[in-house]
Amino acid sequence: MDTVLKCLPSNPDDHCSQRCRLGPKAMALIGAKVGFPVLVSLQSGSCLCTAWPRRDLCDGFVQADYMCSTSHKPMAVFKDTGICLNQIKSMASTKLRKVSVKVVVRSLDVKRATSEAALLETVRDLLRNVFVLNDYVLSVNADSPVVHIEILDTDPATSNAGLITGKTSIVIKEVITLEWYKHKLQEAPQLKVAAMDDTCASLKEIIHMPLHYPETMHKLGLPCPKGVLLIGPPGVGKTLLVKAVAREVGAYVIGLSGPAIHGSRPGESEENLRKIFEKAREAACSGPALLFIDEVDALCPKRGHSNSAPENRVVAQLLTLMDGIDSDNKMVTVAATSRPDAIDPALRRPGRFDREVIIGTPTHKQRQAILEMMISNMPTDRDVDAAALADVTVGYVGADLTALCRDAAMQAVLQASLDSLCNLVSRAHFYEAFKRIRPSSARSSIGRVEFKPVHWEHIGGLEDIKHKLRQSIEWPMKYPEAFSRMGLTPPKGVLLYGPPGCAKTTLVKAVATSCHCSFFSISAADLFSPYVGDSEKTLAQVSNRCSDKRGLALQPLFSLMKLMPWWGPDQKVEQDLGSRKGSFLFSLMSWMA
């Protein structure tokens, strides 16, 4: 039984015949009869065939047709390797009364053009006198509109090979296109998303309902959300999050980017946009589909500029396409941006992007979780502590932490090339990487972020001021439930005043360190501008940065207080309220309100 048979290509006449041609000696050894089922088992899967003698009656060879197998692809391993005779086993057969199948057609046009009765008759002809097993896939002739037929269930349920006869009842449970079927069979890499459990759960909840239960929401009279807008700084993991959620809910992802849309001739951009939406609609006819628009602010900027007619047409086309999405269709549009204020406001109304999910800069615990996940895949020394690295990586997003770990590994490789004894990534390698990898927030032109932690013990004296700062800032952030239970409203702002050098800035850094928040330092030169409306715009950007990063923004108030003499006496302040200084003051008060 250890005889090795050489695999040869099947005869052209045996294509889609389910025949496995063997020599007479091999058929006698396995006890197979002509036309009876045999199971060919391999490491990559198995194939169900019928035993037939070779025409030349030569032993030592096998020619198998791969019509019915556990894989949707022909088993290429047969073509260039040999198999042992004990891998071919004769099977008993049972006539089936009923069989449930899933049909894979070539395209959506074929699916729409073929009626249910015609499709059922085609499947019946293809399955007549064919042996099948549960979860096996039949590959059909290339001339047929049906590409694959997957066996879902058989009656009676048996471990023997089931024979489909003319009396067998065939039930088509599902009809999908070939493109969707390939997508479902594609083995995507496992995506690990750390420190975004809450955001992932929120996004999954928004996407899961319209994709999998559109009929239920329609019966309840609730329109399904058509779009979700992800907002967050660059590198925080928006694209990775969308891919992970789509994989979890089983959605087909169609990507869309600005460079792939824009064309050189007039109207080409709108045409490309319509093609992508049509592709997403076709995918949604077979299963849940997710259209992902990355950097939507570059694709759909605000309209109204005289020199942006092509962009205005693209925005108008996108609005029309999103309005045309059927609420019963299993399709959701997800867009990502780091500049929500640059998007045309018409996109952000309900009915287009119904929900907005904000992803902020990782907190201390989130950075620690990200670092632990990355360090677990690296050969690190014992002195590498994720919590200690999280303390000194304030302002780092996921992409920054990935670059930091990669650079530390490169430092270890460089040292290993010089010293063969060094093969682990140590804490010194991470500190060396800190010199090269700066956080994304440090590259902003507005203000700066302080990264070196300052603890309360580093400040001598000032115990009364420390206690008041803890009461005003630290306690509301650490114990919000207690404040809510007692009906206390946390203060919205704190004003520190005093002579230069009395540790005002250091106290704010200590508060930010104890609360694990980012610290922004904005000077008067950053805020004020000679151009009308520029100062208010800068202040709005600072406000958005503080909201995204959950940080403390106390230093801007301190900087502004030093500008009070520049505003002039009290009577001059009243005269300046109509000027840009007064406009800036009103913007500041609106932000603090």
UniProtKB/Swiss-Prot annotation:
Predominantly, its location class is cytoplasm
**The keyword Cytoplasm is assigned to this record:** yes
Give the record's free-text account of how this protein's activity is regulated. In the context of 55LCC heterohexameric ATPase complex, the ATPase activity is stimulated by DNA binding and inhibited in presence of RNA.
Under InterPro entries, the record lists: AAA+_ATPase (IPR003593), AAA_ATPase_domain (IPR050168), AAA_lid_3 (IPR041569), ATPase_AAA_core (IPR003959), ATPase_AAA_CS (IPR003960), P-loop_NTPase (IPR027417)
GO molecular function term, any single one: preribosome binding
Q: Name one GO cellular component term.
A: spindle
> What PROSITE patterns does its record include?
AAA (PS00674)
PANTHER family for the chain: AAA-FAMILY ATPASE, ATPASE FAMILY GENE 2 PROTEIN HOMOLOG A
Q: What is this protein called?
A: ATPase family gene 2 protein homolog B
Q: Which organism is it from?
A: Xenopus tropicalis
Q: Which gene encodes it?
A: afg2b
